[in-house]
């Protein structure tokens, strides 16, 4: 079984990878927001993959889409719309890589996109199971 892990460079996603790496083959995906942010999250993701033994890290620049969402969407829904888009992109890559799951280090209730109702809306955008 294989999973594509969404790796932000934060705390929760590497914990999810660590917990599942002995059960699944895992590739990782990082969404870069350069030039809106610096390259620190990308560098952290590269370093985390090395430490966790993840051989394949895919980096997708998401800055153009991020800018569109910020400029055109109701800001109350920013996180939900952004996550839905990232999940759709991740699902497409997961299909190409023959992954069975997406792996997300979601910490339920931590931020607005991670409430149960918002997670439900986000998850409806894709057809691949998500391990959280």
Identify the residue ranges that each predicted region occupies.
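ATP-dependent adenylation/pyrophosphate-handling site
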Residues: 2-45
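A conserved beta-strand->alpha-helix junction
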Residues: 48-72
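Short, well-ordered alpha-helices that flank and scaffold nucleotide-derived cofactor binding pockets
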Residues: 18-22, 50, 92
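A general structural motif
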Residues: 7-13, 58, 83-86, 112-113
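Structural beta-sheet core signal
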Residues: 5, 28-30, 59, 104, ...
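Short, ordered loop/turn segments at secondary-structure junctions
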Residues: 31-34, 62-63, 106-108
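Active-site adenylate/phosphate-handling loop in enzymes that bind or generate adenylated species
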Residues: 66, 75-132
């Amino acid at each position: 079984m294989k999973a594509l892990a969404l790796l932000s460079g934060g705390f929760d996603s590497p914990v999810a990878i660590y917990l599942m790496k002995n059960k699944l083959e895992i590739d990782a995906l990082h969404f870069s927001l350069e030039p809106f942010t610096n390259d620190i999250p990308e560098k952290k993701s590269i370093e985390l993959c090395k430490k966790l033994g993840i051989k394949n890290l895919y980096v997708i620049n998401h800055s153009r889409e991020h800018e569109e969402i910020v400029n055109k969407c109701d800001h109350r829904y920013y996180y939900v719309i952004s996550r839905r888009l990232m999940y759709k992109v991740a699902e497409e890559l997961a299909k190409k890589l023959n992954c069975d799951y997406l792996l997300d280090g979601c910490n339920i209730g931590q931020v607005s996109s991670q409430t149960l109702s918002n997670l439900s809306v986000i998850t409806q955008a894709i057809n691949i199971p998500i391990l959280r």
